[in-house]
Design a protein with these regions (language model features):
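Active-site HxH/HxHxD metal-binding segment of metal-dependent hydrolases
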Residues: 1-67, 72, 76
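Conserved small/polar residues in nucleotide/adenosyl-binding loops
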Residues: 308-311
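Hard-cation-handling environments
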Residues: 182-261, 266-283
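Metallo-beta-lactamase
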Residues: 65, 74-78, 83-187
Length: 311
């Protein structure tokens, strides 16, 4: 159709659209509704981090118009004698692009920048958003030396110095969280432990562009950990954890007996309840990292548990 409106997109979008629209559509819709508070009454909605509110109801039908023109790295087009450059800049998604209009010195960056710390993981469920790819993309946008920065969410920023400040703070914040997470990963810390360690330095924590309106640094630490080395924390206790129901039953028995954690750990070990012994030993070590009794219990319980998991 000659009158069809052209829709430009980076080629990775096809896989991403099909994945969300088909493979994981039911759970993504459910978790997205929770993330954005869609079921909440209007008076309970404060904001949604990067906007006021998202309104969807049962009477509305969601649709999708697919792109008509795909590109890989970059594409230059002309519309009404206006030059427009499209470039692939992976960040919040791996199909992200910017729209650069040289004549206007304006760059539209999609969701690779907004007035909130970069959403390195969305709790509705997203695949790994590579922090260093995002940083590299922001550095490429900085090289444009734009006069106007136009995000998809939140207000535009004008003035080259203001744009540079915003983009620099943004990339520095992302890289700091990434680098510190990697540092502690290589020290052997678990995600729970790393979350307690990674805090932004004062000059970044006070930046107006890095406030935690849309997500939290703790979830970004966990996402980075998982993105680099997967779900396993490195603690043998996490290989075959008790179910919530099993743990609840054991805690109830423990409360009825009014035993100390250390005594209960010894009982579990002697009864061959090695997983429970591991988890109790972890509690003791969390209270006192020098607890030799707990370390010995964990070492003894770890041996039989290790035989149940083939590497």
């Amino acid at each position: 159709n000659e009158n069809e409106t052209e829709i430009y997109a980076q080629e990775n979008i096809i896989y991403n659209l099909d994945n969300i629209a088909t493979t994981i559509r039911p759970i993504i819709f459910q978790r997205s509704a929770r993330q954005f508070g869609i079921p909440l009454p209007e008076e309970e909605i404060v904001h949604q981090g990067i906007g006021g509110f998202l309104e969807i109801n049962d009477q509305e039908t969601l649709g999708l118009v697919r792109p008509t023109i795909l590109f890989d790295d970059s594409l230059t087009i002309e519309i009404d004698n206006l030059k427009i450059v499209l470039a692939h800049v992976p960040g919040e998604t791996d199909d992200h692009l910017y729209v650069w209009i040289p004549e206007k010195q304006a760059v539209m960056v999609g969701d690779n920048f907004y007035r909130s710390f970069a959403n390195l993981y969305a709790i509705r469920g997203t695949k790994f958003r590579n922090p260093m790819e995002w940083v590299d993309s922001l550095d490429r946008i900085r090289l444009l030396n734009a006069e106007h920065l136009v995000p998809s969410h939140s207000r535009p920023i004008s003035g080259k110095e203001n744009v540079e400040k915003a983009l620099t703070d943004y990339r520095d914040g992302i890289q700091f969280v990434h680098d510190q997470t990697i540092r502690y990963i290589n020290k052997g810390l678990t995600p729970d432990e790393i979350v307690q360690k990674v805090k932004l330095p004062k000059h970044l924590a006070e930046s107006p562009y890095l406030q935690p309106f849309y997500g939290s640094i703790s979830s970004y630490v966990r996402s980075t950990f998982s993105g680099y080395i997967g779900w396993f924390s490195g603690n043998i206790s996490d290989l075959h954890p008790l179910t919530v129901a099993e743990r609840a039953q054991k805690l109830e028995v423990m409360a009825q007996r009014q035993t100390k954690i250390s005594d209960e750990a010894e009982i579990a070990l002697n009864n061959g309840e090695y997983q429970w012994a591991l988890e109790l030993a972890d509690m003791l070590i969390a209270l006192d990292s020098n607890n030799s009794q707990a370390k010995n219990i964990k070492a003894e319980a770890a041996d039989p548990v290790s035989y149940t998991h083939l590497t």
